[in-house]
């Protein structure tokens, strides 16, 4: 695993991803919780092939700004780039981009854990 590895995915905003549907607002626009979930997923996917079979990553912190609204039907590219490795702590830069405009950005921290040990909480 090295600094700079990344994962990007494109999604098309649908009704289930809206603030109105999720209950985080009352307008049919891309919801902040949806953006965060996809940012976390992109971060997970960026490193999953670099882990042992008995390891995974779990989210520990997220600090993002949702800068602009996005309508149903618009395509969003969400990218996570690994910026720092500190033992089992991984820090990612996360971005959401629509037509070249950043609509969301921030940092996400994940931790490498042993799957079995983690589930024995």
Tell me what each language-model feature is.
Residues 44-76:
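Hydrophobic beta-strand-centered segment that forms part of the acyl-chain substrate-binding groove
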Residues 32-36:
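Conserved N-terminal beta-strand and adjoining loop/helix that marks the start
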Residues 64-99:
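Hydrophobic beta-sheet segments that form the core/acyl-binding groove
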Residues 1-30:
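Catalytic strand-loop segment that frames the active site of acyl-thioester-processing enzymes
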Residues 13, 70, 105, 109:
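Long, contiguous binding/interaction regions
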Residues 9, 60-62, 78, 92, ...:
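Hydrophobic residues positioned within well-ordered beta-strands of beta-sheet architectures
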Residues 2-7, 83-92, 99-119:
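C-terminal binding/interaction regions
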């Amino acid at each position: 695993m090295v600094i700079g590895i990344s994962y990007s995915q494109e999604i098309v905003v649908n009704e289930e991803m809206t603030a109105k549907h999720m209950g985080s607002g009352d307008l049919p626009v891309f919801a902040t919780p949806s953006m965060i979930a996809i940012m976390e997923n992109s971060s997970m996917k960026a490193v999953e092939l670099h882990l042992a079979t008995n390891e995974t990553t779990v989210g520990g912190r997220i600090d993002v700004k949702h800068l602009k609204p996005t309508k149903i039907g618009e395509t969003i590219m969400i990218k996570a780039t690994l910026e720092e490795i500190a033992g089992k702590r991984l820090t990612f830069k996360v971005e959401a981009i629509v037509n070249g405009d950043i609509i969301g950005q921030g940092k996400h921290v994940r931790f490498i854990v042993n799957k079995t040990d983690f589930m024995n909480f």
